[in-house]
Structure formats: structure tokens, C-alpha cells
A protein has these predicted regions:
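A hydrophobic alpha-helical transmembrane-helix feature that marks the membrane cores
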Residues: 1-235
Length: 235
């Protein structure tokens, strides 16, 4: 049986077992493949007639709802899903995300997309290494970061109506900062889960997918806010 240390009142530094490094390697590999799949699907969608389908509001709404359902299924179905089902859901989500992101990417120049991706990759890499190696306990950051995400979404909705340029810039900066911090937080959380779990069979592969999803979401959201920050929209 897979068990977790659920004592949130006192969380001490965890001595990492020999199994931790291979699991983290799995996390990064799956996340990398997921990101690559997203990029391939987005490119294919933009270059084909699929972009017309992606631009359809009804289709886009259905795709977004499906994405939300997949994330919930992966996040809350850890103990119920097999590793094969979890892997399939993760890659289905990554592919569908490429389809929905194609419309967003089309609004920016190629140079802007490349610059934003490069900046995001460097920032993500640095913060993930920090989260993995730091001796500081980042646990308490989680609540504040989630509150920050909720507040950010609310402000973004408000700005849809007032369409403020300066506020949009602030939103972009804050968004990058929040998901930069979440990258370190989630990396440490995944590492601690790996060290605290009694790893048996399927649980190892499932943790790799679960961790990959967390870091994939951090990376994609950081990338989107970086795009907004750098700008360079096509006229």
C-alpha cells in the first residue's frame, strides 16, 4: 500500500532515498515529452485547416472543458488510476492543450514565441533546481501561491472589461512571478512525496506522471504570461 506523511503541522526536512533521483528523472522526462507534444500539435494546428476549427468558440469551449476535466481526473484520481491510464490522460491533455494554445500563439510573432519559450525554459530550470536542492521548507508558500493564482484570475476577468494596458502589464509580471515560485514549490513537494512514499510497483510510474503534470502546468502558465509580458503581437 502507498502511504503518505500527512502531518501538515510539523514538516521536517526529508532525507532523500536512493529512489528519489530516478523518480525525478521520470518527472522531467515525461514533462519534456508532454511539452514537446504540445508544441508539435500547436504547430500542426496552425499550419493546417485545423486552425479554423480551433478558432470556433463552441469547439474551443468544449476543448477547455475537456482539459479541465482531464486535469481534475489526474489530480484527484492518483490512487484510482493505473499508471497506463494516467499516462494516457497526461498525453491526451498535452495534445489537446497544443490545439487550444494554437490560437493564442497565432497572435504573436515567431520571434516573440521563441524568446518567451527560451526565457521560460531558463527561469523554469533555475527555479526547479532551487526547489529540488534548497534546505528551506517551501510548504507554507503553497497556500499563499494558490491565493495569488485565484486573485490573478479575478483581476484578469476584471481587465477583460476595462482593457487597461498598464494593468495587463502588471498581470503579466505577477503571473510570471507566481508560477516561478510555484515551480520551486511543486518541485520540492514532488521530491518530498517521493521520499516519504512507500514505493511499490505502479505507484512509482504514477508519481512520475503526477509530478510531470504539476511541472508541465507551471511551465505552460509561466510561458503564457511571459508571452504577454514580452508582447510583440502581430498587427
Amino acid at each position: 500500500m502507498t502511504t503518505f506523511n500527512t502531518n501538515d503541522d510539523q514538516i521536517y526536512p526529508v532525507e532523500r532515498g536512493l529512489e528519489l533521483q530516478p523518480i525525478m528523472r521520470q518527472v522531467y522526462v515525461w514533462m519534456g515529452f508532454g511539452t514537446l507534444l504540445t508544441a508539435i500539435v500547436a504547430y500542426f494546428t496552425i499550419k493546417t485547416s485545423l486552425i479554423n476549427l480551433a478558432a470556433n468558440p463552441a469547439v474551443m469551449l468544449g476543448a477547455v472543458v475537456a482539459e479541465f476535466a482531464m486535469v481534475l481526473g489526474l489530480s484527484f484520481g492518483f490512487n484510482r488510476l493505473s499508471s497506463g491510464m494516467a499516462t494516457g490522460l497526461f498525453f491526451a491533455y498535452a495534445a489537446l492543450n497544443g490545439f487550444t494554445l494554437s490560437v493564442v500563439l497565432l497572435a504573436f510573432s515567431v520571434g516573440t514565441v521563441i524568446s518567451a519559450f527560451a526565457a521560460t525554459a531558463v527561469l523554469f530550470g533555475v527555479m526547479s533546481v532551487i526547489g529540488y536542492t534548497t534546505k528551506l521548507d517551501l510548504t507554507k508558500m503553497g497556500t499563499y501561491l494558490m491565493m495569488g493564482v485565484i486573485g490573478l484570475v479575478i483581476v484578469m476577468v476584471v481587465n477583460l472589461f476595462i482593457n487597461s494596458g498598464p494593468l495587463d502589464m502588471i498581470i503579466s509580471i505577477v503571473g510570471v512571478l507566481i508560477f516561478t515560485a510555484l515551480t520551486a514549490y511543486d518541485t520540492q513537494r514532488i521530491g518530498r512525496m517521493a521520499a516519504e512514499m512507500n514505493l511499490e510497483g505502479d505507484a512509482v510510474a504514477k508519481l512520475g506522471i503526477f509530478g510531470a503534470l504539476k511541472l508541465y502546468l507551471d511551465f505552460i502558465n509561466m510561458f503564457l504570461f511571459m508571452l504577454r509580458l514580452i508582447g510583440g503581437k502581430r498587427r
